[in-house]
A protein has these predicted regions:
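Metal-dependent nuclease catalytic cores that hydrolyze phosphodiester bonds in DNA/RNA
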Residues: 1-183
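Short histidine-centered catalytic/ligand-binding loop motif
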Residues: 43-46, 205-217
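Residue-level signal for well-ordered alpha-helical scaffold segments within enzymatic catalytic domains
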Residues: 59-60, 93, 191, 225-229
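Hydrophobic/aromatic-lined pockets within catalytic cores
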Residues: 61-66, 175, 197-200, 231-235
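Secondary-structure boundary elements
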Residues: 157-163, 188-195, 231-239
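Coil-to-beta-strand transition motifs
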Residues: 164, 177-181, 188-190, 259-261, ...
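Conserved catalytic cores of phosphodiester-cleaving nucleases, focusing on short active-site segments
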Residues: 184-209
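Metal-dependent nuclease catalytic regions and adjoining charged, substrate-binding loops involved
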Residues: 215-220, 225-346
């Protein structure tokens, strides 16, 4: 077993083990899982604008302003540099106005401009100087992220959720020989905190929108799996069978290992221009501590979903192996009434 405090996100995703996302894909269909998994040799991991924005949002909320500024730089605004030479044509015009040669490639033209005036306002150089090799983010996106982060930090009882812990902690363990993995948004000494965004285009009460987001995205499976994985890691910390990778305070690690029962909290933030913030605890029992109480149905549903997906993974791995697509082996059958939603019969 491994707990890694420094693993880059790309390495985590490439690691060949079953994750919660994989379990949820399996519950859609085995082929959905295989196509999106490391087993598919033609899988493409496209770094979309949405993914880039999500990483920036997580960096700011989970790790704070300083950590965000170490990685991201706001792209300069062209309106603040009205005389900037942005295109090749701009530089040619600049050279032509000074009766200097203005033909050649962009690199040749740039060199000629700088030879004429080492302080010439070449836009590419302005951007490079301002960003210093960091990831570039537009000012409007950076402002939106900052407003969202401040909305979370200002909420009583929620603002401390992402403090006094560690962000992006990777866990690796086994379930009866099946390699598993999870990546915790934020690990505290006695709690896991997971940051989620949700949309509310239908303008439902926000608590209803959050609950539907949990159901639609099967977050209850995630809550169960993360708690289960962490408990296995903690037992290994006590017995010495869990390997610790990365820089971590020993006192913090000891506190994690000695916590009898970690709690799990989702922090939800609305993502469509209205940064509402809600926090919900995912717990096994109606009364925290579980002293003889009946488990919450949503917890049991998460447990069942996790183990159903895990069992399906093992069946498909045994039947198909890693190197061919996991096409579902189903026979044709007629529809039955229970295949359809009730509103169809109105």
């Amino acid at each position: 077993m491994i707990i890694d405090f420094n693993m880059p996100e790309s390495e985590y995703h490439a690691y060949p083990a079953l994750s919660v996302s994989g379990v949820k894909d399996l519950l859609v269909s085995p082929l959905d899982f295989w196509v999106r998994s490391w087993m598919n040799p033609e899988k493409e991991d496209k770094d979309t604008d949405a993914k880039k924005l999500g990483r920036a949002y997580h960096k700011r909320v989970l790790e704070g302003v300083e950590a965000f500024q170490e990685v991201y730089a706001i792209k300069p605004n062209k309106a603040d540099h009205e005389d900037a030479l942005v295109t090749c044509e701009d530089m040619r015009d600049w050279l032509n106005a000074r009766k200097l040669p203005h033909s050649g490639s962009k690199a040749e033209i740039t060199k000629r401009v700088l030879q004429a005036d080492c302080n010439a306002p070449i836009w590419d150089l302005i951007v490079a100087e301002k960003t210093e090799g960091k990831e570039i983010i537009s000012s409007d996106k950076a402002e939106s992220i900052e407003l969202a982060a401040r909305a979370i930090e200002a909420q009583p009882g929620i603002g401390e959720s992402f403090k006094d812990g560690r962000a992006e902690v990777s866990l690796f363990w086994e379930e009866d020989g099946t390699p598993m993995k999870s990546r915790l948004d934020y690990l505290k000494s006695a709690a896991i905190v997971d940051l989620k965004t949700f949309s509310n285009s239908l303008r439902k009460p926000v608590d209803v929108a959050v609950s539907q987001a949990v159901a639609n995205n099967k977050y209850h499976i995630q809550g169960y799996a993360y708690l289960r994985g962490l408990e296995k890691i903690k037992k290994g910390l006590v017995t010495g069978s869990t390997k610790v990778i990365g820089d971590v305070d020993e006192a913090f690690l000891e506190a994690v290992a000695n916590t009898k029962r970690h709690r799990f909290f989702f922090v939800f933030q609305q993502a469509d221009g209205v940064p509402n913030v809600l926090a919900r605890e995912f717990r096994e029992f109606e009364t925290y501590g579980g002293l003889g109480m009946t488990p919450n149905a949503y917890y049991t549903a998460g447990e069942n979903g996790f183990h159903t997906g895990l069992a399906l993974y093992r069946q498909c791995m045994e039947f198909f192996g890693k190197h061919k697509p996991w096409h579902p082996m189903t026979k044709p059958r007629p529809f039955v009434d229970t295949d359809f939603p009730m509103w169809m019969f109105d």
